[in-house]
Curated annotation (Swiss-Prot):
Protein name: Antizyme inhibitor 2
Subunit structure: Monomer. Interacts with OAZ1, OAZ2 and OAZ3; this interaction disrupts the interaction between the antizyme and ODC1. Does not form a heterodimer with ODC1.
One cellular component (GO) term of this entry: granular vesicle
InterPro entries per record: Ala_racemase/Decarboxylase_C, De-COase2_C, De-COase2_CS, De-COase2_N, Orn/DAP/Arg_de-COase, Orn_de-COase, PLP-binding_barrel
PTM characteristics: Ubiquitinated, leading to its proteasomal degradation; a process that is reduced in presence of antizymes. May also be degraded through the lysosomal degradative pathway in a proteasomal-independent manner.
Species in which this protein is naturally found: Rattus norvegicus (Rat)
Classification lineage: Eukaryota, Metazoa, Chordata, Craniata, Vertebrata
Length: 457
């Protein structure tokens, strides 16, 4: 192993153990004081499988993980052990990944609008890859970090995407030549051409267009004296089952277009941000009912239906200003699982779930049909791994989410066998070696040089 993980960091569980299994087992054996806290549960096996899947479909691509997605230490350590690089948007994120031992060569300062203090921190601690998308940002980098390797960002017009990153990030193709010329004037080295595709984009062909645009930028750079040797494929990969576009569809488009637009001798190393793909579905979160309001009586609905509807309002210890922020930003509708499965003859009531904020926006979900709950009951929400459990609540006095990390013995042994020792894993700048370090990716399993648990896939 590379040395990021300690067995004591994780609860060791049986193979096939789910986050729900972990939650139920730990809750049954916990005291009331412990179970009354907001808690999240993470089983690392799914991340290990997703990493192998990523290498299978994109063997040339080196994944980077955006720390802002989920900066839980257990997650970062597993990803570091798997060999991922880290995309950091702040000084605090760079400090965090360096604290667990990640070398500066595997860190990108990927915020295109950086504070000067952040640039100086990167310079002091050896982080040389910095992104930019305009001349003003470039001037700041030249002044505060003259040895930096610049990372120019080109936008992709993902008109159908859920999050339109081009509103804030990326330089249009029209202005890219002038930005590249500014790099030359600042005596910086331009080494990479990334592009951004918004999360939730339903059209895989957006990646094809982006790769074609990046090829044009490579040509512009060559004409102005820059030999760009890295192509960053951006992010936006689907991370949940049932997404409109499957991960395999996206990788198929990328796989077909990369050889066409980057043929030998332009066989450039590739990087990407596999953020939501890695963690979205690997956490479940437990919250509690803290208050309950009596069924609401609506004269209007009574007149329309002929019967008084029973709508119960439950208040939870977390809301949309904390772990359920996806309700505001991603238009999700969280659906809880109950502590106990209701019997077939148990009546269901129209119910709504609200967070602790005293305002009309902190509605987690409504229109749910649930059995009658009591104060102190807990509800479980799946798919809480991305921009959720690690989000600091905007409400004063709310508690941090306590995370329990688990891993099967099989996944632990797979991690032990799949990487070189840290001192041998010297990652040279500009060189994109396969993260598998000798692992052969096949259709059904990953065959390691010494040990390979076939069932991990």
């Amino acid at each position: 192993m590379a040395g990021y993980l300690s067995e004591s960091d994780f609860v060791m569980v049986e193979e096939g153990f789910s986050t729900r299994d972990l939650l139920e087992e730990l809750t049954l054996g916990a005291s009331q004081a412990t179970t009354g806290k907001v808690a999240a549960f993470f089983v690392a096996d799914a991340v290990v499988r997703k990493h192998f899947c990523f290498l299978k479909y994109l063997p040339r691509v080196r994944p980077f993980y955006a720390v802002r997605c989920n900066s839980s230490l257990g997650v970062l350590k597993v990803l570091a052990e798997l060999g991922l690089g880290f995309s950091c948007a702040s000084k605090a994120e760079m400090e965090l990944v360096q604290h667990i031992g990640v070398p500066a060569s595997k860190i990108i300062c990927a915020n295109p609008c950086k504070q000067v203090a952040q640039i100086k921190y990167a310079a002091k601690h050896g982080v040389r890859l910095l992104s930019f998308d305009n001349e003003v940002e470039l001037a700041k980098v030249v002044k505060s970090h003259p040895s930096a390797k610049s990372w120019g960002e080109v936008l992709t017009l993902d008109a159908l995407g859920l999050h339109h990153t081009h509103r804030r990030v990326g330089c249009s193709l029209m202005f890219q030549a002038s930005v590249i010329a500014s790099v030359a004037q600042g005596y910086l080295e331009l080494v990479c051409q990334p592009f951004h595709i918004g999360s939730g984009c339903p059209d895989p062909q957006a990646y094809a267009q982006s790769i074609a645009d990046a090829r044009l930028v490579f040509q512009m750079g060559a004409e102005l004296g820059h030999t760009m040797n890295i192509l960053d494929l951006g992010g936006g990969f689907p991370g949940l089952e049932g997404a409109k576009v499957r991960f395999e569809e996206v990788t198929s488009v990328i796989g077909k277009n990369i050889p066409f637009y980057t043929p030998p001798p332009c066989h450039v190393p590739l990087r990407t941000h596999a953020t939501k793909k890695m963690t979205s579905s690997d956490f479940c979160c437990r919250v509690h009912v803290t208050a309950k309001e009596k069924p609401l009586f609506s004269p209007f609905l009574t007149e329309q239906t002929g019967a008084a509807p029973k709508s119960i309002v439950y208040h939870l210890d977390e809301g949309v200003y904390g772990v359920f922020n996806s309700v505001l930003f991603d238009n999700t509708c969280p659906t809880p699982a109950l502590q106990k499965k209701p019997s077939a003859d148990q009546p269901l009531y129209s119910s709504s779930l609200w967070g602790p904020a005293v305002d009309g926006c902190d509605c987690v979900a409504e229109g749910l049909w649930l059995p009658q709950l009591q104060v102190g009951d807990w509800l479980v929400f799946d798919n809480m791994g991305a921009y959720t459990v690690d989000t600091k609540s905007l409400l004063g006095g709310t508690q941090a989410c306590r995370v329990t990390y688990a891993m099967s013995r099989l996944a632990w042994e797979a991690l032990q066998g799949q990487l070189l020792p840290a001192e041998e894993d010297q990652d040279a700048e500009g060189v994109c070696k396969p993260l598998s370090c000798g692992w052969e990716i096949t259709d059904s399993l990953c065959v390691g040089p010494v040990f390979t648990p076939a069932s991990i896939m």
